[in-house]
C-alpha cells in the first residue's frame, strides 16, 4: 500500500465503456517512449477538382462500365461490388446434418444468410474536397442524403419482400484506413440483420434504461456537459467529446443533446447543426498534424425495424476512430495485448481532448498557408 496520490496522467488504470460493457487499459506513462516502429507515408493531397481516371468523379466510367452522371451535389449509387446482395437464395440448414443428430456441429458451427444492399455516397463532385474543406451547406446535403436513405429504406423494409433491420452509414478516410479511392465518399450498408457491434450497444442501452429508467447516452451527455473537460465541439443540438473510455488516441463521440432516435427525426435545425459540428471536428482533426487526417467514422441510430424497446432506447450518435498517435506519420496499432487481452491506449482522454480543444475549428490549415 502507498499513501501517494493516484495521478491519472502518470499511472496505469482501466476505464469502463458502458456501450460495449468492456474495459480499456490506459497507460499514460508510455506516451514518453521513443518510437522506432513503422511510419505512414505522407501522400500529397489531391489538388485537382476533377480526375479523369477516378471512378467516382462526375461523368467518368466506373470499373463495371457504368457511367456516372455529371452530378453537382451529393450523389448516391448502388455499390458495384457490394458486400451483401438481395439476389441470393435463402440459407437453409442441411437436412442431412439435422437427421444425423450432429448436435455438436450445429451447436458450434452456426450460420445465418444475410441479404441487403450497399451504396456509395459521393459527398460532392469535387475530387479534392474532404468534409473539412466543404462548405457547411454542402455537408448539409450529405446529411440530407443520409436521412433520405434511412427513410426510404425503412419504408422499403416495412412494405417490401425483405425486412431490412439496420442501415450502417460510414466513411473510411485515407489510405491508412484502407480507403481504395481518394475521392471524398462514404458508404451505406443495409442489412436484414443487426450488426454485432450495434446489437451490443443496443443491448447495453436497453439494460441501462431498465436499471436506471433513463437513457445511457442522455445521462452521459449531462455528465460531459457538467464536467466540460472532454468536450471538443458543441452547438445547440450536439456535443463532440473524447469519450472517457476512448481507445484510439484522438477518438471522438458525437452525441445528440436531446433524445433523437434516428435521422428520421431530424428537422432542419438538427441537419444544419450536425453539418456544422462535422465541419468543425474534421477541421480540428486536419489542423492537429497539418495533414488530411485519416479515420473511420460511422453513425449509430435506431434500427430500420426492431422492437419498441430497441427503437425507444436508441440515441443518435457517431463514432470517429482516427489512428494517428504522435504525428502525421505515426499511427496506433491494435496488436499483441490489445488483440489477446484488452484494448489499451497511451495518453488519457483528457490529454487528447485538451489538444483538440486548443485547435481552430473554423480555419483550415490549408487556408492559412
UniProtKB/Swiss-Prot annotation:
- Pathway where this protein functions: Carbohydrate metabolism; galactose metabolism
Reaction catalysed by this chain? alpha-D-galactose 1-phosphate + UDP-alpha-D-glucose = alpha-D-glucose 1-phosphate + UDP-alpha-D-galactose
One GO BP annotation here? Answer: galactose metabolic process
Q: Which Pfam families match?
A: GalP_UDP_tr_C, GalP_UDP_transf
Active site location: 185
Query: GO CC: one term?
Result: cytoplasm
Q: Reply yes or no: does the keyword Metal-binding apply.
A: yes
- Which SUPFAM superfamilies does this UniProt record tie to the protein? HIT-like
Q: Which cofactor does it need?
A: Zn(2+)
Task: Check the record and name the InterPro entries matching this protein.
Answer: GalP_UDPtransf1, GalP_UDPtransf1_His-AS, GalP_Utransf_C, GalP_Utransf_N, HIT-like_sf
Q: How many cofactor units bind, and how? A: Binds 1 zinc ion per subunit. Zinc binding seems to play a structural role.
Instruction: Quote the record's binding site residues for Zn(2+).
Output: 54, 57, 127, 183
Q: Which family does it belong to?
A: Belongs to the galactose-1-phosphate uridylyltransferase type 1 family.
Mind telling me what this protein is named? Galactose-1-phosphate uridylyltransferase
Amino acid at each position: 500500500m502507498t499513501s501517494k496520490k493516484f495521478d491519472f496522467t502518470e499511472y496505469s488504470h482501466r476505464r469502463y465503456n458502458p456501450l460495449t460493457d468492456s474495459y480499456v487499459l490506459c497507460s499514460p506513462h508510455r506516451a514518453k517512449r521513443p518510437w522506432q516502429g513503422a511510419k505512414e507515408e505522407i501522400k500529397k493531397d489531391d489538388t485537382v477538382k476533377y480526375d479523369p481516371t477516378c471512378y467516382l468523379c462526375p461523368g467518368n466510367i466506373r470499373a463495371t462500365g457504368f457511367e456516372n452522371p455529371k452530378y453537382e451535389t451529393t450523389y448516391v449509387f448502388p455499390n458495384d461490388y457490394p458486400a451483401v446482395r438481395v439476389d441470393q437464395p435463402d440459407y437453409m440448414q442441411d437436412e442431412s446434418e439435422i437427421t444425423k443428430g450432429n448436435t455438436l456441429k450445429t451447436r458450434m458451427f452456426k450460420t445465418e444468410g444475410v441479404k441487403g444492399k450497399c451504396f456509395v455516397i459521393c459527398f460532392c463532385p469535387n475530387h479534392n474536397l474532404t468534409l473539412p474543406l466543404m462548405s457547411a451547406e454542402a455537408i448539409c446535403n450529405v446529411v440530407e442524403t443520409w436521412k433520405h436513405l434511412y427513410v426510404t429504406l425503412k419504408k422499403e423494409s416495412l412494405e417490401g419482400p425483405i425486412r431490412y433491420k439496420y442501415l450502417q452509414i460510414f466513411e473510411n478516410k485515407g489510405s491508412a484506413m484502407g480507403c481504395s479511392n481518394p475521392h471524398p465518399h462514404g458508404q451505406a450498408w443495409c442489412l436484414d440483420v443487426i450488426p454485432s457491434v450495434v446489437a451490443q450497444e443496443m443491448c447495453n442501452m436497453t439494460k441501462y434504461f431498465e436499471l436506471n429508467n433513463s437513457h445511457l447516452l442522455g445521462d452521459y451527455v449531462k455528465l460531459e456537459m457538467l464536467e466540460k473537460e472532454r468536450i471538443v465541439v458543441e452547438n445547440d443540438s450536439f456535443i463532440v467529446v473524447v469519450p472517457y473510455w476512448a481507445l484510439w488516441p484522438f477518438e471522438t463521440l458525437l452525441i445528440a443533446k436531446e433524445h433523437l432516435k434516428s435521422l428520421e427525426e431530424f428537422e432542419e435545425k438538427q441537419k444544419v447543426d450536425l453539418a456544422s459540428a462535422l465541419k468543425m471536428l474534421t477541421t480540428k482533426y486536419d489542423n492537429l498534424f497539418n495533414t488530411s487526417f485519416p479515420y473511420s467514422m460511422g453513425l449509430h441510430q435506431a434500427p430500420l425495424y426492431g422492437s419498441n424497446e430497441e427503437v425507444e432506447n436508441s440515441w443518435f450518435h457517431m463514432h470517429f476512430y482516427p489512428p494517428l498517435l504522435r504525428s502525421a506519420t505515426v499511427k496506433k496499432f491494435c496488436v499483441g495485448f490489445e488483440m489477446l487481452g484488452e484494448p489499451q491506449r497511451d495518453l488519457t482522454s483528457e490529454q487528447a481532448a485538451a489538444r483538440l480543444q486548443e485547435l481552430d475549428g473554423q480555419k483550415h490549415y490549408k487556408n492559412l498557408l
